[in-house]
Amino acid sequence: MATQKFSYFLLVLLMVFALILPSIISVEVIPCIAGSKCTNDMTYNELCRFKGFSKGGFCQKYVHQTIGRCCCHPTGLESQESSISGDTNVVITN
């Protein structure tokens, strides 16, 4: 009887772990520049492009804060934003 209760507990524990594990693995790390302070996105957009981040950077601010820190968009994972062209002279044919 004790082994059946233990097996049931172990099964539930394994299922919870299996549900949590993928979210832990898939966390996208956003590199931020240590000690940086910013007030707008334009300041660090060019700096991140210069450092090799093709999508540029942004100013990460927290609630009720006027000064944030500079973070760069990671380039390793492609998203839907990567399909948007910066070229304004794109011809779309039907």
From Swiss-Prot:
Record keywords: Antimicrobial, Disulfide bond, Fungicide, Plant defense, Secreted, Signal
Transmembrane segments: none
Main location: secreted
Gene Ontology CC entries for this record: extracellular region
Signal peptide: 1-26
UniProt feature coiled coil, ranges: none
Pfam family of the protein (one): AtDEF-like
Disulfide bond sites: 32-72, 38-59, 48-71
Subcellular location: Secreted
A GO biological-process term: killing of cells of another organism
Domain of life per record: Eukaryota
Sequence similarity: Belongs to the DEFL family.
Protein's name in the database: Putative defensin-like protein 88
Organism in which the protein naturally occurs: Arabidopsis thaliana (Mouse-ear cress)
